[in-house]
């Protein structure tokens, strides 16, 4: 069912070509020793610190408009937010709380099980640099849509518990989800590099985005848009010579780690178990990665 979008007055006054400076807490990404920094306008990218082409790429033309009252997606967002408040203090709530972190070391740990490898910034510096640089690019582009739609976060619309301090997210917008964009960027690239573990890796990336719904800081529609935003931007950067070179370097690094893991018989970790979607019916048989 295609629901026609009705532009709200608070969106009408926004200038289509405007880009806000990246001022959120995720604007600066720094890994000691890697020298990776992201803090500029999407149209002022330093060629040495981005995989994006110089040509203009507008994510606003790609993602669906943010839901407004009268849109069926708006009503679905309200229902999902209220129902998922019942997950407070559950195992899934605790996972969502852990997924609040965007630190590269924590993300590498989260994806280690699905990847079947112990990944750290120390043993995989080229992989870490690739993922951080790509995620900075996808986040910059995603921020354009955030500042265009300026949609409120769900806990500002309906009352309910959230899994992180409201002050950490109250000064930024809901749609599309930046956390989801980051998680899907990491998952997509890791799945490209480790296709034999793609199911487990992509499922973890999906769960990372769904954690924002469970946490109560993003609407379900914002999570869906965050995945699309990441995928679209990743598609645009594929032809970048620097991106291709960094992918090749990361692949060599992973091949070395796989050889070391095989020698120590540690491939095949508890991460083989795929985290069920929060939208999976209770009677759906649990699936295990192959």
Where are these regions (language model features)?
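Active-site catalytic microenvironments for nucleophilic, acid-base chemistry
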Residues: 189-193, 232-236, 240
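Acidic, carboxylate-rich catalytic segments that either coordinate divalent cations
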Residues: 242-290
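N-terminal secretory signal peptides that target proteins for export/translocation
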Residues: 1-21
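Hydrophobic alpha-helical bundle signature of multipass membrane enzymes
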Residues: 43-214, 246, 257, 279, ...
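Bacterial N-terminal signal peptides
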Residues: 25-35
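Catalytic tyrosine of NAD(P)H-dependent dehydrogenase/reductases that use a Tyr as the general acid/base
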Residues: 21, 175, 218
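Bacterial Sec-dependent signal peptides at the C-terminal "C-region" and cleavage site
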Residues: 34-46
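Interfacial helix-loop-helix junctions of multi-pass membrane proteins
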Residues: 208-236
